Amino acid sequence: MAPKKSKKSKKEESMIDFVEEEVTGDVDEDGFEQAEDMPDEVDSDEDEPPKKKKKVVKKEIKQELELTDEKLQELLEKYEASKATATKTKDDFKHLPKSQRGKALKRALRKDKRARQGERAQIRDELGESAPQKEVPKTIESMREYDATMVNEEDDEVEHDEANDEFAPYFNRETSPKVMITMTPKAKITTFKFCFELQKCIPNSEIFTRKNVLLKTIIEQAKEREFTDLLVVHEDRKKPNGIIFCHLPEGPTAYFKINSLTFTQDLKKFGESTSHFPEVILNNFNTRLGHNIARMLACLFPHDPKFTGRRVVTFHNQRDYIFFRHHRYEFKKEGSKAALLELGPRFTLRLKWLQKGTFDAKWGEFEWVLKRHEMETSRRRFFL
């Protein structure tokens, strides 16, 4: 077998080419020409062929597609067609048992909805700047019926009423909150527990056990002791089911029904409350009635919160249900994020009536009373 020829490297070939080039200079004794300016070392990198550049697969900037009028119209029609709802019914799943048809229909509708959403997203990417704007989701709150009593912050009449109403001394810092908490006669342990939870949330509050004493008598005693607010917790079937808010000394008085009560110990994760004055957040009280209720709730808490405690008490109104939450916010590293730790309790209030002045069941003047069958004729009608 013939011996294999050794492959020469690029460096060796460049050296041979360099020696074979004609150079000018004197010839030495051995017959070799001497170059005048021969370099000591040969740089082979100069004679190497240039390396091929790698093709870039991922482009940093996406090229904008130039859409013709016909293509644009076709994509827009396709986008609108993808909004159509599915036409599948239970009759399409007759081959399944009756107990499984409902779940199968929901599963198919959900799958079809996801597919149409993905199709619309793809069309929006193709359209680019020509894509139509996303529609705002329709909710009961966004479709709320018009109410003539909606409060405008720049309304002079509202400002005049607030400057002369029963809560003006509190907002003018003429008085500081002092709250009395009591309950119905012969209250059970659960009601007492709820009163202690309220005392934990409301600073400067005191609990008084109530025996067979009339509520009017309690109001007069609270005035003599210079209390600014009175809370009376009612119970039904050994559980709290309502609460009376009475602002002293001139009222007004409101009655709320209590729903979805969860004590602190029943929460999955909770923290210990501190004695710092909390911040108060009042959300979504938009009408004149809602504005008065919000001012009544604000009067329960001191004016200047202590931000070092990071306590927050929230009254969030949604569809005339007032959700109560008690949190402490905690900052994460570098202060870029914050987390909420619930301190409890958790409950929901529903306004039943509002009475002018202090509580008077016989001769009291009611400003507003909830009559469900007469007033709740539409799901989109709210009063707070």
Curated annotation (Swiss-Prot):
Residues 18-48 have a biased composition (Acidic residues). Residues 96-114 have a biased composition (Basic residues). One of its GO terms (cellular component) is preribosome, large subunit precursor. Coiled coil: none annotated. InterPro entries: Brix (IPR007109), IMP4/RPF1 (IPR044281). GO terms for molecular function: rRNA primary transcript binding. Residues 115-127 have a biased composition (Basic and acidic residues). This is Brix domain-containing protein F44G4.1.
